[in-house]
Amino acid sequence: MKTLWKHCHIASMAHGKYSIIEDAAIVTSGALIEWIGPQAELAEPEHDNCIDLGGAWVTPGLIDCHTHTVFGGNRSGEFEQRLQGVSYAEIAAAGGGIASTVRATRAASEDELYASAERRLRHLLKDGVTTVEMKSGYGLDLENERKILRVIRRLGNTQPVTVRATCLAAHALPPEYADRADDFINHICNEMLPALAAEGLVDAVDAFCEYLAFSPEQVERVFITAGQLALPVKLHAEQLSSLGGSSLAARYNALSADHLEFMTEDDAIAMAAAGTVAVLLPGAFYFLRETQLPPMDALRKHGVPIAISTDLNPGTSPGLSLRLMLNMACTLFRMTPEEALAGVTFNAAKALGMSATHGSLEVGKVADFVAWNIERPADLGYWLGGDLDKRIVRHGVESSI
């Protein structure tokens, strides 16, 4: 079915810029964009349906390219403890921190995990998100990593959103592998990843390269295994220290390296050469009250694509609004509204290996877009919270969230 969407202004985000088209129209054919441009240039169209967007600003559907949406339990109690003066070390010694999320996730059924994740996902969808990445990493054994990834696939099959599943088994050491990191990496490479990939549950492989997680040498073994399984890689890197993880990611042509507060200019040069996207996570920066800013000047100087994401997770970024992250990126990292919007559209699609089909409004791409009742595109990163008036279109069909 062909639909004409008329009477709008468009920030198409082609090439990562606003690429504004005033007084515009879009023609969709099924799930794809067939024509886009100034309405005055549109020949008398043949269409089955005509929708007047009432002068709205249209952007690509937002893409949340780094989330940990599926988990059991809730760590708001720890949040309260920390603000009462209890240290993270004390919380961890008492069984809190990531260990508590692993226990809760292992104890939860697949249906329970689905129900809680679906509630969180709904908040993102109401914010204009049409594509989301979700990671495993709170199971840390084959049975429970499989359970999380099955929930992720189920969410993608039942909710009005495109979902990419990332296996983050190399997230932390499970209790049964305490002080045996190399053995756990062997287990991931020899058993977990091959089994999960064979079941079709994995779109990409991630790891956490940090002094409190896994070394670059251990991460490299995970990357080698991912390559043997023909799976692209991503990496949590340089969040708390500089270990060269982002350069390692670049050597393996990673889709993205994420966090990056402690990355160096040499890391930026390597990422630019590899086309690896820098995914910045202002929610975690804010929630942890970090002070080391990502090296924005180096990223810009060397042309590293920059994406923004919620990092939705129970411990360090319980963020349910991607639009709020736009404001945080502008305010905390001094990104421009145009850069920030590119970070949740054009560059976010790159970070998921989806730039051929998603991330900008161009002929032949998937017709995922949002018609916002705003005065200008910068409004998306300006307003703090709230539910902006909008119409969400996914695969050429208006979606009711």
Swiss-Prot record:
Functional pathway: Amino-acid degradation; L-histidine degradation into L-glutamate; N-formimidoyl-L-glutamate from L-histidine: step 3/3
Residue numbers binding 4-imidazolone-5-propanoate: R75, Y138, H171, Q239, T316
EC number(s) from the headed UniProt entry: 3.5.2.7
Signal peptide boundaries: none
Subcellular location: Cytoplasm
Cofactor(s) named in the record: Zn(2+); Fe(3+)
GO biological process, any: L-histidine catabolic process to glutamate and formamide
Keywords, comma-separated and alphabetical: Cytoplasm, Histidine metabolism, Hydrolase, Iron, Metal-binding, Zinc
Keyword NAD assigned: no
Enzyme class per UniProt: hydrolase
Pfam families: Amidohydro_1
Record text on cofactor binding: Binds 1 zinc or iron ion per subunit.
Family, per entry: Belongs to the metallo-dependent hydrolases superfamily. HutI family.
NCBIfam families: hutI (TIGR01224)
Function: Catalyzes the hydrolytic cleavage of the carbon-nitrogen bond in imidazolone-5-propanoate to yield N-formimidoyl-L-glutamate. It is the third step in the universal histidine degradation pathway.
Protein name: Imidazolonepropionase
Lineage, uppermost ranks: Bacteria, Pseudomonadati, Pseudomonadota, Gammaproteobacteria, Pseudomonadales
